[in-house]
């Protein structure tokens, strides 16, 4: 995810696995008009990594993200898991990876795809405890292996994430000219999907 306007700023933020997020505030209201209301610019050269987008009205006017968040429903809404969580555990040494447990009892570890020895340095600097938990919606797996056991070929099937997700460089709401996803506030739903 870019921070700011990518035409003016080349800084990139890697959001990582489940729970990575950026909160963006605005000095004006975004009006919910017919059709798309705002866009999220993504890295044009990146692989599709569909991400859920949440919005929050500032009803109390304090300009802080302290009210109810609403998920923007996308094309995989009915295939997603609500009230999902992942708990990450601090690596016990600089040579180890961060491990995780999810709300379904699955376990694993964060592994770097950037040729670093471990993911221990990825730990959240503001987190002083040995674990941190993120809650949200889990999308279906993006990639599918269309190859064989000896010759794997992982790809995101065309049309799987047709609309409604950030960091997804395909679909009906993707604007290839500026590399953005055009999103509609009318798709906002509460934690119960209403």
PLM features: what roles do these ranges have?
Residues 56-62:
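Short loop/turn segments immediately following beta-strands, especially the blade-tip
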């Amino acid at each position: 995810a870019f921070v700011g306007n990518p035409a003016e700023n080349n800084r990139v933020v890697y959001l990582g696995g489940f729970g990575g997020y950026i909160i963006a505030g605005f000095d004006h209201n975004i009006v919910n008009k017919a059709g798309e209301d705002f866009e999220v610019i993504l890295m044009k050269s990146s692989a599709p990594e569909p991400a859920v987008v949440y919005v929050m009205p500032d009803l109390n006017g304090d300009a802080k993200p302290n009210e109810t968040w609403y998920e923007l429903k996308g094309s995989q809404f009915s295939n997603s898991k609500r009230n999902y969580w992942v708990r990450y555990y601090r690596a016990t040494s600089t040579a180890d990876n961060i491990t995780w447990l999810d709300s379904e009892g699955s376990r694993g570890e964060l592994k770097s795809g950037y040729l670093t020895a471990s993911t221990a340095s990825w730990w959240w600097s503001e987190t002083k405890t040995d674990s941190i938990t993120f809650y949200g919606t889990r999308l279906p797996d993006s990639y599918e292996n269309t190859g064989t056991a000896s010759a794997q070929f992982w790809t995101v099937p065309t049309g799987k994430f047709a609309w409604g997700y950030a960091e997804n460089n395909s679909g009906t709401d993707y604007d290839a000219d500026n590399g953005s996803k055009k999103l509609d506030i009318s798709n906002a739903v509460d934690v119960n999907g209403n």
